[in-house]
Amino acid sequence: MITEVKRDLVALLKEAVGDIPITYDFLGENTAKGLVVTNLNMNIESNLSGDLDFDTVTADIMIISPYVNEVDQLADALLRDAPYGVGWIMGLQFTGASFTGDPTTGLHVCTLNISCEVNANGPGD
């Protein structure tokens, strides 16, 4: 299920960023080309009662780029009209964002906090 959620997140990010060059770096390999999406940490809270057919997934996505405008543009696209923006439409709710800048490396970091519900029974159920 984690792989499916990662795939869905990649699709969502691609839709949000449009033409911005972006690299999805879920393995932690470093790259300075375009935006880097890394540190996708997920916590799955299963619905133990069985009343509902989905689990709640929370994720923190760290976006790193030497270009602060790209980071701002991406965050704006993802958080636009929250909770009814692009994320909400695809079942993901962006619940917050934080920004930091590293004067030593010149990299700008946006960490997005995400909450989403995924089908606990797998695709097609």
Residue ranges and their predicted role:
Residues 1-51, 69, 73-80, 85:
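Small/polar-rich, solvent-exposed N-terminal microdomains that initiate assembly or binding
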Residues 21-23, 41, 53, 58, ...:
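Ser/Thr- (and often Asn-) enriched beta-sheet segments in non-cytosolic proteins
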Residues 80-125:
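Acidic-leaning, charged glycine-interspersed low-complexity segments
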